[in-house]
């Protein structure tokens, strides 16, 4: 839709539908969104009634804050890099961990694992960027690495909204 802050909204909604998670009642549960700015996926989470902790050094679209107020859900934006997170300050009950950070998999996957080890989210939706042929050739390696720390089962595909990236869903 034209009124959403970014393309991440579409990628998140497609991931939910692909796994059949679009029918889940997520109201009142907590999501942790790594790489949240400008707020497309966060917007979708809030539309579904989730409380969201967003992690990103970037600015959030004001529509995200407005929607959170209108929906009566909590949205906190920590303006820090995922690698600088104080893990002990993260919520302990995380239903969904999202990550859509524009970094190469060898840089971002260890950060996802570090956060997942701390919060033990029940489900993960990850966008893994494969911006070069060399990274594309290693896609199976990256998925196997994610399988080592993510809740089972782990699935990966390229959704219609994905460009040079794959969607990995776990849990």
Protein language model features and the residues they cover:
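S-adenosyl-L-methionine
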Residues: 1-27, 47, 51-96, 104-106
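Short acidic, S/G/P-rich loop/turn micro-motifs used as interaction or catalytic elements
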Residues: 41, 84, 103-105, 131-133
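Active-site proximal loops enriched in glycine and acidic residues that flank catalytic Cys/His/Asp
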Residues: 56, 79, 101, 128-130, ...
């Amino acid at each position: 839709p034209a009124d959403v802050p970014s393309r991440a909204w579409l990628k998140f909604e497609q991931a939910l539908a692909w796994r059949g998670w679009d029918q889940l009642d997520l109201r009142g549960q907590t999501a942790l969104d790594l790489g949240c700015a400008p707020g497309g996926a966060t917007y979708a989470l809030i539309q579904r009634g989730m409380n969201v902790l967003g992690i990103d050094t970037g600015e959030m679209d004001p529509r995200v804050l407005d929607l959170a107020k209108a929906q009566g859900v909590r949205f906190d934006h920590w303006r820090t890099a995922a690698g600088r997170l104080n893990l002990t300050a993260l919520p302990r009950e995380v239903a969904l961990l999202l990550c859509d950070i524009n970094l190469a998999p060898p840089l971002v996957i260890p950060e996802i694992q570090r956060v997942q080890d701390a919060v033990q989210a029940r489900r993960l939706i990850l966008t893994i960027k494969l911006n070069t042929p060399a990274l594309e050739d290693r896609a199976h390696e990256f998925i196997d690495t994610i399988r080592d720390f993510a809740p089972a089962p782990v699935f990966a595909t390229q959704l219609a909204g994905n460009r040079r990236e794959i969607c990995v869903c776990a849990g």
